[in-house]
A protein has these predicted regions:
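Glycine-rich phosphate-binding loop of ATP-dependent small-molecule kinases
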Residues: 1-157
Length: 157
């Protein structure tokens, strides 16, 4: 089984993905985990990603897709749930090509919808609990706006 779980920051994607992974014996994949794994392995693609991250830049789609290709190839015969990936239409197109190259298909896409005010309140509380001073309400609202601009259009894709 190949699942995607999508939704805005604070919607509970990671929480729900963990529950589904356990219930259906799936490998839970998040972009952050994949990045860390590739960097820890000092793989070529991991080192590329680390260069961008160390400079404070976003990791480009082509690097993320290269990582995803490597990871999904390793797990091609396993059930997986992708948490929060893809985030953009180019990533979705690339992911579709990866699955085609593996002769696999996405079985289902789960989109979690939560009221924006609830999301902001959750993330503000989470920031307070984690002690992250950089997660201000302004930053949180900006992340929601970026999601609406770049990721929400995937729902129609």
């Amino acid at each position: 089984m190949k699942l995607l779980i999508m939704g805005p920051p604070g919607a509970g994607k990671g929480t729900q993905a963990k529950i589904l992974a356990k219930k259906f014996n799936l490998v839970h994949l998040s972009t952050g985990d994949i990045l860390r794994k590739e960097i820890d392995k000092s793989s070529e693609v991991g080192l590329k990603a680390q260069t961008y991250m160390n400079a404070g830049n976003l990791v480009p789609d082509e690097v993320l897709l290269e990582m995803m290709q490597s990871t999904l190839t390793e797990l091609k015969d396993s059930g997986v749930i992708l948490d929060g990936f893809p985030r953009t239409i180019p990533q979705a197109i690339g992911l579709s090509k990866i699955f085609q190259s593996l002769n696999k298909a996405i079985d289902s896409i789960i989109n979690i919808e939560v009221d924006k005010e609830v999301l902001i309140a959750r993330l503000v509380q989470r920031a307070k609990n984690s002690g992250r001073a950089d997660d201000t309400e302004e930053v949180i609202v900006n992340r929601q706006n970026v999601y609406e601009e770049l990721t929400a259009p995937l729902i129609e894709f």
